[in-house]
Amino acid sequence: MAISIYNDFSDYMLFKGIKNVQTTDFKYKNIDVDITEDLVIKQFDAIYDFHQKSWGFNGYLRNRLNNNTGKIIEEYKIYIKKLVSDINNIKRDEPKNPFEELIIEYGEGAVKRGQACISAVYQTDYIGIISRSMKRNEVCLGNTDFQNLQKENYTYVVSFEHCSYNVVEMDCFILLSKLRRKGAKLDFQRLAREFCYIEGLDTSSSEFITALVSYPHEFMKCCNKYREGKNKDYEDRFYKKLSKALIQDGDSLF
């Protein structure tokens, strides 16, 4: 049996009927517009169509896809360990600025919440989710927001550059997490269930998505940037960002 050869995965998706368009063709260009749950569910239909057309790819790519399965979970675990170390160091040496005072005030809560999210992930059928993904050769679009993906008569995609092998649940997580951090007032647990209904996934998958969406992403990201920053003269800027992160992350979803 002959093996099909493509330069990029986008070439394969075009062959499968996905349309490559410019972002100016899209109705919802701004993620800050009022996003309703019905609109998100419609986006899930577009994501599902992409998934259906990408499942089971066994051709040859000159520019191969990355395999990001499990990557975000491992990154989130590392962020927790680094924040624990930061808290211990700041306590030992005393806070040097308002940013570090915020770390002392809210850091342990962020650690506990992050640990609870990771624990919730492992309480789902996480291994089963990965096994299913590998058997089906699942591919995620990676950028599932309204500026990159839309479905009308056809499914339209602006960029395929973030495509990777990964569990399909991640495409839902990426969308919901971004909407939550933008301040969208949505029932994220219900939306996780709706996505899984459309994709034919079980409750373990919806619980997996909810756990990841609940993770204090912005708090951890801000701490990482402060830790890695070469110029420590921007404490005031980091303080404002961390204060904003507390709002963006919202309350725990479980």
Q: Each PLM stretch: what is its role?
A:
Residues 219-254:
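ATP/Mg2+ or Mg2+-diphosphate-binding catalytic cores
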